[in-house]
Amino acid sequence: MVASGDYLDVTTPQIEAGTGASSFIVTGTAPVTRASDMVTVPIKNNLYNLPFTVLCEVHKNWYKTPNVAPRVFDTGGHQTGAGIVMGFGSSGGYDGFPYCDIGGSDRRINENAGLEKMLIGMRVKSERSTCVVSNGKLSSETKTKWEYIRSTATIRIGGQTTAGLRHLFGHVRNFRLWHKELTDAQLGEVVE
């Protein structure tokens, strides 16, 4: 017999492929909804100034952008003009193209919009040339006005807010940040 206040713990395996993709989140006894899969990391001791390169593997679980601009990562708590964004956008016939935006330099790779899995990244050289990379394909470079980011800022991986704004709806793994500009050859990794 079940008495008032009794509860049953139920767990399910995590399934990352197929039509029933799921994740298991451990919660207490209070009923909850699925949390936004977002990680926040302090900038302090992780990033400050130029040059730098970011690379990570991304699997997006959609073929049409689910919101204005799903984020792989961006920054919060930074000074004016110091924001960094890497994610997916849509424009015209290209939906889900990889892009980066830092200090007024918006770079994109339209032809990789249809990829579900990819290695995505951005490189900012010491002389301020910026590009985005997706599965070994580099965008053209443009100069950024970005110089540094204050140490109280944060890196947000997988979305923009815990409320789900610009949520990725996908998986990010092997997130890497170098305090140097990688070569074109080093940016040539491909995820299939």
Give the label of every model feature segment.
Residues M1, L8, T12, G87-W146:
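Extracellular glycan-interaction surfaces
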Residues M1-G5, R150-L177:
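Extracellular glycan-interaction patches encoded by glycine-rich segments
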Residues I15-Y48, T65-P66, R173-E192:
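Extended recognition patches within non-cytosolic domains
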Residues A35-F52, G77, D106-N112:
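Short surface loop/edge beta-strand patches of beta-sandwich-type extracellular domains
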Residues I43-K44, P70-R71, G96-C100, I155:
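Short Gly/Ser/Thr-biased coil->beta-strand turn/linker motifs
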Residues N45-N61, G83-V85, E116-I120, V172-L177:
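A carbohydrate-recognition surface predominantly in extracellular/luminal proteins
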Residues V58-K60, V124-S126, T161:
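Short beta-strand segments enriched in hydrophobic/aromatic residues
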Residues R71-F97:
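Glycan-recognition/cleft segments
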